[in-house]
Protein backbone atom coordinates (compact mmCIF):
# COMPACT_ATOMS: atom_id res chain seq x y z
CA UNK A 1 0.00 0.00 0.00
CA UNK A 2 2.85 2.38 0.78
CA UNK A 3 4.29 1.76 -2.65
CA UNK A 4 0.99 2.60 -4.28
CA UNK A 5 0.71 5.74 -2.20
CA UNK A 6 4.15 6.90 -3.31
CA UNK A 7 3.27 6.35 -6.95
CA UNK A 8 -0.02 8.19 -6.52
CA UNK A 9 1.75 11.17 -4.91
CA UNK A 10 4.25 11.26 -7.75
CA UNK A 11 1.49 11.33 -10.36
CA UNK A 12 -0.28 14.21 -8.54
CA UNK A 13 2.94 16.15 -8.29
CA UNK A 14 3.62 15.73 -12.00
CA UNK A 15 0.12 16.94 -12.82
CA UNK A 16 0.52 20.01 -10.65
CA UNK A 17 3.91 20.76 -12.08
CA UNK A 18 2.42 21.58 -15.44
CA UNK A 19 0.43 24.45 -13.90
CA UNK A 20 3.08 25.89 -11.59
CA UNK A 21 6.34 27.30 -12.70
CA UNK A 22 9.14 24.89 -12.53
CA UNK A 23 11.22 25.34 -9.46
CA UNK A 24 14.88 24.74 -9.38
CA UNK A 25 15.65 21.22 -10.30
CA UNK A 26 17.05 19.24 -7.49
CA UNK A 27 17.79 15.60 -7.33
CA UNK A 28 17.27 13.47 -4.31
CA UNK A 29 17.84 9.81 -3.85
CA UNK A 30 14.76 7.75 -4.30
CA UNK A 31 13.46 6.31 -1.08
CA UNK A 32 14.12 2.67 -0.48
CA UNK A 33 11.17 0.63 -1.52
CA UNK A 34 10.13 -2.21 0.80
CA UNK A 35 7.80 -4.82 -0.56
CA UNK A 36 4.83 -5.45 1.60
CA UNK A 37 4.50 -9.04 2.82
CA UNK A 38 2.06 -11.02 0.75
CA UNK A 39 -0.30 -13.18 2.71
CA UNK A 40 -0.12 -16.88 1.78
CA UNK A 41 -3.16 -18.28 0.19
CA UNK A 42 -4.39 -21.37 2.01
CA UNK A 43 -5.98 -24.04 -0.16
CA UNK A 44 -8.47 -26.38 1.49
CA UNK A 45 -10.01 -29.39 -0.16
CA UNK A 46 -13.58 -28.87 -0.98
CA UNK A 47 -15.82 -30.91 1.30
CA UNK A 48 -17.29 -34.00 -0.32
CA UNK A 49 -20.90 -34.39 0.27
CA UNK A 50 -21.67 -37.89 1.57
CA UNK A 51 -24.09 -39.83 -0.46
CA UNK A 52 -26.74 -41.33 1.71
CA UNK A 53 -27.85 -44.78 0.62
CA UNK A 54 -31.23 -45.82 1.66
CA UNK A 55 -31.41 -49.42 2.94
CA UNK A 56 -33.15 -51.58 0.43
CA UNK A 57 -35.78 -53.78 1.96
CA UNK A 58 -34.96 -57.54 1.69
CA UNK A 59 -37.10 -59.44 -0.64
CA UNK A 60 -39.23 -61.93 1.17
CA UNK A 61 -40.57 -64.95 -0.62
CA UNK A 62 -43.56 -66.30 1.18
CA UNK A 63 -43.36 -69.58 -0.77
CA UNK A 64 -39.69 -70.35 -1.54
CA UNK A 65 -38.72 -73.09 -3.98
CA UNK A 66 -35.30 -74.49 -4.78
CA UNK A 67 -33.60 -77.75 -5.67
CA UNK A 68 -29.93 -78.78 -5.92
CA UNK A 69 -27.75 -81.88 -6.03
CA UNK A 70 -24.07 -82.80 -6.33
CA UNK A 71 -21.89 -85.89 -6.27
CA UNK A 72 -18.18 -86.74 -5.83
CA UNK A 73 -16.50 -90.00 -6.81
CA UNK A 74 -12.69 -89.97 -6.67
CA UNK A 75 -11.14 -93.35 -7.36
CA UNK A 76 -7.68 -92.10 -6.43
CA UNK A 77 -8.53 -90.97 -2.89
CA UNK A 78 -11.58 -93.18 -2.40
CA UNK A 79 -13.80 -90.17 -1.67
CA UNK A 80 -17.37 -90.96 -2.69
CA UNK A 81 -20.37 -88.92 -1.54
CA UNK A 82 -23.47 -87.21 -2.90
CA UNK A 83 -26.38 -85.02 -1.77
CA UNK A 84 -29.66 -83.74 -3.15
CA UNK A 85 -32.23 -81.44 -1.56
CA UNK A 86 -35.43 -79.68 -2.59
CA UNK A 87 -37.75 -77.21 -0.88
CA UNK A 88 -41.33 -76.26 -1.48
CA UNK A 89 -42.57 -73.63 0.90
CA UNK A 90 -41.79 -74.74 4.44
CA UNK A 91 -41.30 -78.40 3.52
CA UNK A 92 -37.75 -79.58 2.90
CA UNK A 93 -36.81 -83.03 1.61
CA UNK A 94 -33.40 -84.41 0.83
CA UNK A 95 -30.82 -87.15 1.27
CA UNK A 96 -27.08 -87.62 1.29
CA UNK A 97 -24.81 -90.66 1.08
CA UNK A 98 -21.20 -91.31 1.96
CA UNK A 99 -18.89 -94.36 1.89
CA UNK A 100 -17.59 -95.16 5.38
CA UNK A 101 -14.07 -96.52 6.01
CA UNK A 102 -15.49 -99.99 6.72
CA UNK A 103 -16.65 -100.28 3.11
CA UNK A 104 -20.37 -99.69 3.67
CA UNK A 105 -22.47 -96.99 2.06
CA UNK A 106 -24.39 -94.83 4.55
CA UNK A 107 -27.51 -93.10 3.18
CA UNK A 108 -29.53 -90.56 5.20
CA UNK A 109 -33.02 -89.52 4.06
CA UNK A 110 -34.37 -86.48 5.89
CA UNK A 111 -37.45 -84.25 5.92
CA UNK A 112 -38.34 -81.03 7.73
CA UNK A 113 -41.64 -79.17 8.07
CA UNK A 114 -43.27 -76.87 10.66
CA UNK A 115 -45.50 -79.63 12.03
CA UNK A 116 -43.17 -82.65 12.36
CA UNK A 117 -39.84 -80.91 12.66
CA UNK A 118 -36.69 -82.60 11.40
CA UNK A 119 -36.69 -86.38 10.85
CA UNK A 120 -33.97 -88.58 9.40
CA UNK A 121 -33.73 -92.26 8.44
CA UNK A 122 -30.29 -93.86 8.17
CA UNK A 123 -29.63 -96.87 5.95
CA UNK A 124 -26.41 -98.87 5.61
CA UNK A 125 -25.67 -101.22 2.74
CA UNK A 126 -22.49 -103.06 1.83
CA UNK A 127 -20.89 -102.13 -1.42
CA UNK A 128 -20.59 -104.70 -4.16
CA UNK A 129 -17.12 -106.09 -4.63
CA UNK A 130 -15.26 -104.27 -7.33
CA UNK A 131 -14.77 -106.21 -10.51
CA UNK A 132 -11.12 -106.27 -11.38
CA UNK A 133 -10.54 -106.51 -15.09
CA UNK A 134 -7.42 -108.48 -15.78
CA UNK A 135 -5.08 -106.99 -18.29
CA UNK A 136 -4.74 -108.85 -21.54
CA UNK A 137 -1.76 -111.19 -21.44
CA UNK A 138 1.26 -109.97 -23.31
CA UNK A 139 2.78 -112.48 -25.65
CA UNK A 140 6.29 -113.25 -24.52
CA UNK A 141 8.93 -115.36 -26.16
CA UNK A 142 9.66 -118.40 -24.07
CA UNK A 143 12.89 -120.27 -24.65
CA UNK A 144 12.72 -123.85 -23.51
CA UNK A 145 15.49 -124.70 -21.13
CA UNK A 146 17.00 -128.18 -21.19
CA UNK A 147 15.78 -130.34 -18.38
CA UNK A 148 18.47 -130.79 -15.82
CA UNK A 149 18.32 -134.07 -13.98
CA UNK A 150 20.40 -134.81 -10.95
CA UNK A 151 20.93 -138.37 -9.82
CA UNK A 152 20.07 -138.91 -6.22
CA UNK A 153 23.15 -139.71 -4.16
CA UNK A 154 23.52 -143.38 -3.33
CA UNK A 155 23.75 -144.03 0.34
CA UNK A 156 26.91 -145.98 0.94
CA UNK A 157 27.15 -148.56 3.64
CA UNK A 158 30.49 -148.21 5.32
CA UNK A 159 31.68 -150.99 7.53
CA UNK A 160 34.50 -150.52 9.93
CA UNK A 161 36.33 -153.51 11.30
CA UNK A 162 36.60 -153.21 15.00
CA UNK A 163 40.19 -153.09 16.15
CA UNK A 164 41.45 -156.20 17.84
CA UNK A 165 42.35 -155.28 21.35
CA UNK A 166 45.37 -157.26 22.43
CA UNK A 167 46.37 -157.06 26.00
CA UNK A 168 49.76 -158.30 26.95
CA UNK A 169 50.66 -158.69 30.55
CA UNK A 170 54.28 -159.27 31.45
CA UNK A 171 54.77 -161.03 34.72
CA UNK A 172 56.86 -159.16 37.16
CA UNK A 173 60.00 -160.95 38.25
CA UNK A 174 60.01 -162.27 41.76
CA UNK A 175 61.74 -159.91 44.04
CA UNK A 176 63.83 -160.80 46.97
CA UNK A 177 61.16 -159.79 49.44
CA UNK A 178 58.34 -162.09 50.24
CA UNK A 179 55.49 -159.60 49.75
CA UNK A 180 52.94 -161.03 47.27
CA UNK A 181 52.50 -159.31 43.93
CA UNK A 182 48.99 -157.90 43.61
CA UNK A 183 47.67 -157.41 40.08
CA UNK A 184 44.72 -155.10 39.40
CA UNK A 185 42.79 -155.41 36.16
CA UNK A 186 40.47 -152.57 35.08
CA UNK A 187 37.56 -153.61 32.89
CA UNK A 188 37.31 -152.05 29.44
CA UNK A 189 34.81 -149.10 29.52
CA UNK A 190 31.73 -149.52 27.37
CA UNK A 191 31.96 -147.35 24.26
CA UNK A 192 28.87 -146.12 22.40
CA UNK A 193 28.91 -144.54 18.96
CA UNK A 194 26.03 -142.52 17.52
CA UNK A 195 25.19 -143.78 14.05
CA UNK A 196 25.74 -141.05 11.38
CA UNK A 197 22.80 -140.00 9.23
CA UNK A 198 22.23 -142.09 6.12
CA UNK A 199 25.15 -144.34 7.02
CA UNK A 200 25.00 -147.84 8.32
CA UNK A 201 28.00 -148.63 10.42
CA UNK A 202 28.50 -152.06 11.88
CA UNK A 203 31.14 -153.00 14.34
CA UNK A 204 32.19 -156.55 15.06
CA UNK A 205 32.64 -157.44 18.66
CA UNK A 206 36.22 -156.84 19.73
CA UNK A 207 38.24 -159.97 20.18
CA UNK A 208 40.13 -159.68 23.40
CA UNK A 209 43.20 -161.89 23.48
CA UNK A 210 45.14 -162.13 26.65
CA UNK A 211 48.68 -163.36 26.52
CA UNK A 212 50.39 -164.35 29.68
CA UNK A 213 54.16 -164.84 29.80
CA UNK A 214 55.35 -167.48 32.21
CA UNK A 215 57.47 -166.50 35.11
CA UNK A 216 61.11 -166.65 34.06
CA UNK A 217 63.13 -169.30 35.89
CA UNK A 218 65.78 -167.70 37.94
CA UNK A 219 68.77 -169.88 38.82
CA UNK A 220 71.73 -168.92 40.84
CA UNK A 221 75.10 -170.60 40.22
CA UNK A 222 77.02 -171.72 43.22
CA UNK A 223 79.92 -169.42 43.98
CA UNK A 224 83.24 -170.52 42.67
CA UNK A 225 85.69 -171.68 45.26
CA UNK A 226 88.88 -169.79 45.04
CA UNK A 227 92.02 -171.92 45.06
CA UNK A 228 95.12 -170.25 46.12
CA UNK A 229 98.34 -171.78 44.71
CA UNK A 230 101.47 -171.16 46.62
CA UNK A 231 104.04 -168.94 45.02
CA UNK A 232 106.67 -171.06 43.33
CA UNK A 233 110.09 -170.80 44.85
CA UNK A 234 112.32 -168.75 42.73
CA UNK A 235 116.05 -169.47 42.80
CA UNK A 236 118.75 -167.53 41.09
CA UNK A 237 122.02 -169.22 40.18
CA UNK A 238 125.01 -166.99 40.26
CA UNK A 239 126.56 -166.77 36.84
CA UNK A 240 129.95 -168.32 36.46
CA UNK A 241 132.56 -165.99 35.10
CA UNK A 242 135.61 -167.46 33.40
CA UNK A 243 138.58 -165.32 32.56
CA UNK A 244 141.05 -166.47 29.98
CA UNK A 245 144.48 -164.92 29.71
From Swiss-Prot:
SS bond partners: none
Domain of life of the organism encoding this protein: Eukaryota
UniProt GO cellular component terms: extracellular matrix
Lineage summary: Eukaryota, Metazoa, Ecdysozoa, Arthropoda, Hexapoda
Record comment regarding domains: The tetrapeptide (A-A-P-[AV]) repeats found throughout the protein are also present in many proteins constituting the protective envelope of other species.
Keyword Protein biosynthesis: no
Protein name: Cuticle protein
Family annotation (InterPro entries): CHIT_BIND_RR_consensus, Insect_cuticle, Insect_Cuticle_Struc_Prot
Entry's Gene Ontology molecular function annotations: structural constituent of cuticle
Keywords: Cuticle, Repeat
Domain Chitin-binding type R&R: 25-86
Spans annotated as Disordered: 79-100
Start and stop residues of the Sequence repeats: 92-95, 108-111, 118-121
Pfam families with a match to the protein in the record: Chitin_bind_4 (PF00379)
Function in brief: Component of the cuticle of African malaria mosquito.
Amino acid sequence: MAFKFVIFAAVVAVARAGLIASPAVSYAAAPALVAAPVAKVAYAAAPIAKVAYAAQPEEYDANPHYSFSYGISDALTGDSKSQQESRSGDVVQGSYSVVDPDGTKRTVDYTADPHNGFNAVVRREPLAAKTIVAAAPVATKVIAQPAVAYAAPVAKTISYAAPVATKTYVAQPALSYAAPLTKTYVSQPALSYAAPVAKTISYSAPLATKTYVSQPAISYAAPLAKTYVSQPALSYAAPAYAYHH
